[in-house]
A protein has these predicted regions:
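Extended, small-residue-rich solenoid/repeat segments and analogous flexible loops
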Residues: 1-40
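Right-handed parallel beta-helix
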Residues: 7-16, 19-30, 33, 43-56, 65-79, 93-108, 116-120, 171-174, ...
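Residue-level marker of regulatory loop/turn positions in helix-turn-helix DNA-binding domains and
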Residues: 15, 38, 61, 91, ...
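Short glycine/acidic-rich loop motifs that flank beta-strands on beta-rich extracellular proteins
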Residues: 11, 32-37, 55-62, 78-84, ...
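Asp-box/WD-like beta-propeller blade repeats and closely related beta-sheet repeat scaffolds
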Residues: 85-89
Length: 187
């Protein structure tokens, strides 16, 4: 058996206005904060990584363009899996961030509501080909325009909450152009 105790209250990786970096095959665990934070920059990739036992969110991407989390496993977080924020709602310029071919499970150990596997805020973000399971609230939560959610498999969500959907948004008639298609949602 292994026991982990983290005293670290900062991200394990923190990128600010950095572009064109790929982190591949890393195991990131044991911080009380977010595992990875990317702010600004362009075209950074988190690929084939295992992100687990995190106090807050697995990956937080804010601003910049074209960042991606691909083929990675995110599990056992205190809050959510991946949070994407990008694009400009005034001009409808897309952010181009995406989460693809990832496996999310056992998230939201600390916070139970509104900490999805994938959160998308802004314009032109994508969640596709992901497996999302064993979650207390919604699997994908989005705000904004022109987002694409497709080919995701979602099961065993809303395990500890109610009044929620697998893919969820709400109460803003300006959220237009979003596409939800070809997802497999089951229990």
């Amino acid at each position: 058996a292994e026991t982990l105790l983290s005293l670290l209250d900062q991200p394990l990786l923190k990128l600010a206005d950095v572009s064109n970096l790929t982190f591949r095959g890393l195991i990131l665990e044991a911080t009380r904060a977010n595992a990875i934070e990317i702010r600004g920059g362009a075209s950074n990739r988190i690929a084939g990584c295992l992100i687990r036992n995190i106090g807050n969110t697995g990956v937080v991407i804010e601003g910049g363009t074209g960042h991606a989390v691909v083929s990675s496993d995110v599990s056992d977080t205190g809050d959510g899996g991946v949070s994407l924020t990008g694009g400009d709602r005034q001009t409808l310029s897309p952010g181009g961030h995406f989460v693809e071919n990832c496996h999310f499970q056992r998230l939201g150990r600390w916070s139970k509501c509104y900490v999805p596997a994938v959160a998308m805020t802004g314009v032109g973000l994508r969640a596709s080909h992901n497996l999302i399971q064993d979650h207390p609230h919604c699997a994908i939560l989005y705000w904004g325009n022109d987002h694409l959610m497709e080919f995701n498999e979602i099961h065993h969500i809303a395990l500890e909450t109610g009044d929620v959907g697998a893919i969820y948004t709400g109460r803003d008639y300006t959220f237009r152009g979003d596409k939800i298609r070809h997802n497999f949602i089951h229990h």
